[in-house]
C-alpha cells in the first residue's frame, strides 16, 4: 500500500497564528525553518508569507480611500503584474492590493453590463471560483479559522511541543541559561587577565578558542579583525617585511623588559636632545636655594653649566692717558705724514714703456662722408621714383583687410574707416591742408627751376636729362619684374609653409606623447619580463 501524501497548506488556524507570533518573538524574522518546525502543516515559506502579509503589526488593513484606488489603478497601468513593487509603493500587502484591484474591475464590469453592484464580500467570494474542500492558493492572507470545542490529537501534540520549546524565555530554564552565559563571560575575562599578567612576566600564552556558534563568527580577541591581505605587486618587499618584523620584535622585547612607560621615557630622552638640555637647566627655586649656599671658594663657580671665562688681551694703553683729540688739523697732518712715508717705501720706477699713438680718424671720416653721400643719392632716387607712374601689385590679399565700421561714433573710428578705404582702393592716404600748401609751394619752385633749365639752348643738357630718364625707366621696369617674381615665389612657398606647420603640429601634439606612452609601457613590461625570468631561474634551481 502506498504511503499517504501529506500536503502542507490550507487555511491557518488560530492556534497556528499564536504559535507563529511566539516563535517570531523568540527566533526573529530570519530563522523561518526553525519556526516552521513548530508547525506540522506549514513550511518555512508559508510562515514567512503569513507573517509578512497578515500578522505583521506594521501592516495597514484599513479600507481603501478614493485617492488610494486612483493611485492603485495608475500603478497597475504603469507596472503590470509587479505586485511586490506596487505593495511597497502603496504601503499595503500585495494580496490586499490584488483583491482590491479585482473588486474595482468587477464593479466596473457590472456597471457596463447593467447589473446591480454587489457588496465587497460577495465581490471577494466571486473573484475566486473555489470549492469548499479545495486548498486556497492565498490562504496566508485570509482570516484564521476559529478553534473547535475540542482540539485534535495532532493539534494538542503540536501545542505541547511548542510550549516546551518557546517557554524557555521564562522560568527556571531561562534563569539557568542566563547564569551559564554570565559564567562563561566571567571565565573569559579571568583568562584575559591571567594572560596579561603572564605576558608581563615574559610568558606568552594563548587563549582557548571557544566553540563557534556559527561558521562566520568573528573572534574579537584576534590581532586583526577583518584583515585584508594586500595583493602581490610588481616589486619584491620581502626584505622590508623582514625589517619591520624585526623592529616589532625588538619593540615587544623592550616593552617586556622595561615596561611601556619607562621605554617611552627612554625613547623621548634619546630622540629629543633639546629636551635633555632643558632638563639639565636648573629651576628658579633651585637657583634660590643654591645661591644661599655659594661661597667664594665654592666649586659651583666652576660648574660645567656656566659659560667659560672670557679671556681678553691686556690693554695697550692705560685708561688714564687716553683723551679725546681737540684739533682735527693735527690728525690730518699725521695722516699726510704717514702717507708720504708709505710712498717713500715704494721701489723706484723703471720707466720701461712706450707711448703708442692711435691711428688717425681720416679714414673713418671719409667713410662717414661717403655713407652720407650714398644716403642722399638714395633719397633723391626714391623721390623721383615716387613721382613716376607705376603698376600696382596685389601682394596683400583683400580678405586680410578688416571690415569698415558701420556707424562711427568718434574721431578714431572715422580715421580707421579712412585708412581701410585707402587700403582697399590702393590710394594714397589723405593729407591735411597745411601739408598740401607746403607741397604746392615746393612744386611751384621745382617747376620754375625746370622751366629755367629747359629755356637753355644747350643740347648737351637736354641729352643728359633724356638719358637719365631712360635709365630710370629701365631700372623701374627691372624692379617691377623682380617684384612680380617674388610674388610668384610667395604664392608657391605659402602652401608649403602651411603644410609644414600642420605636420609639425601633428608630430608634437599627437605622435610624440603617443610614442612616450608606448615607450613607458614597453619599459614596464620589459622590467616585468626580466623579473619573471629571474624568479623562474631561482625556482628551477
UniProtKB/Swiss-Prot annotation:
Subcellular location: Cytoplasm; Nucleus
Comp. bias intervals (Basic and acidic residues): 263-273, 280-289
Biased composition (Polar residues): 290-299
InterPro entries per record: CDC5L/Cef1 (IPR047242), Homeodomain-like_sf (IPR009057), Myb_dom (IPR017930), SANT/Myb (IPR001005), SANT_CDC5L_II (IPR047240)
Subunit structure: Associated with the spliceosome.
Protein name: Pre-mRNA-splicing factor CEF1
GO cellular component: cytoplasm; Prp19 complex; U2-type catalytic step 1 spliceosome
Signal peptide start-end: none
GO BP, sorted A to Z: generation of catalytic spliceosome for second transesterification step
DNA-binding region per Swiss-Prot/TrEMBL record: 32-55, 83-105
Superkingdom of the organism of origin: Eukaryota
Region (Disordered): 115-152, 250-299
Entry's family note: Belongs to the CEF1 family.
Main location: cytoplasm
Entry keyword set: Coiled coil, Cytoplasm, DNA-binding, mRNA processing, mRNA splicing, Nucleus, Repeat, Spliceosome
Species this chain originates from: Candida glabrata (strain ATCC 2001 / BCRC 20586 / JCM 3761 / NBRC 0622 / NRRL Y-65 / CBS 138)
Domain HTH myb-type positions: 1-59, 62-109
